[in-house]
Amino acid sequence: MTMKSIVITSGKGGVGKTTVTACLGRALAELGNRVVLLDADFGLNNLDVVLGLENRVVYDVADVIENRCRARQALVEADTRNLFLLPSAHGYLGNNVTAQNIKLVLNGLAPTFDYALVDCPAGIEAGFNRAVGACDSALVVTTPHISALRDANKVVALLSSYNMQPTLVINRVRGDLLASGKIPSKDEIETLLKATVDGVIPETDGVYNLAAMPKKPFDMLAKRLCFGTGEPLDPAADYRGFWGAIKRRMKRS
């Protein structure tokens, strides 16, 4: 199997992109894939924190590019079998940390891994171009709110200049609001952004680490990426019908 490199990106910050990267990586690894997560959000990186690996980091991707260590020396093994982190650089980035050189690092890891997920900075500036230029495909993370969808639409359009047809992950979806029609549905978002939704992640209050995140929606997303099968999770399923209407009223109270 040829390694697939996927950039996880978003137009708007704060949509949960880094958490999606970590949870999707875990789900892919639990399907038996060898997965490396590369944190390309230089300066604002926290993928190591979400994974609970911040105290194990010795080298980072800049050290690899600057030949201060080999790529395998910089890898940090996560608690999930087959899941590894290539940490982001802290502080000043030299001129050698480019999309081309990040891609060379990924190419060097390709014989060992099935998937490389690259956590991209929010926005569409230099960090975006560096991360996207190193990858072959893209997942755009958004929430079902108008400001996030507007920014995601810009990112989807921009990715076409890289000859990418990204798919979408809709994060932080409240099932009660979806069932009552107060936020757009999966189909409506697909029509708006002209892209396929591969994953729908329900809202989870106060969860910021990998161990506490629900696994089911990410397992479903991983199976769609690996096998092209199944449908994304429907967070509104429990809020439809007679009893669902009661649950919606209780949610509002």
Spell out what each predicted region is.
Residues E125-I146:
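Inter-motif core of Ras-like GTPase G domains
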Residues L37, V118, V140, L168-I170:
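Structural beta-sheet core signal
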Residues T2-A40:
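Walker A/P-loop phosphate-binding motif and the immediately C-terminal alpha-helix
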Residues A29, V132, S160:
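Gly/Ala-rich phosphate-binding loop of Rossmann-like dinucleotide-binding domains
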Residues S161-S253:
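C-terminal lobe/tail of nucleotide-utilizing enzymes
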Residues L149-Q165:
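Conserved C-terminal guanine-recognition region of P-loop GTPase G domains, centered on the G4
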Residues L37-P111, V207-A211:
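P-loop/Walker-type NTP enzyme "switch/lid" segment
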Residues F42-L44, G91-Y92, G123, H145-I146, ...:
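Conserved nucleotide-binding/hydrolysis micro-motifs of P-loop NTPases
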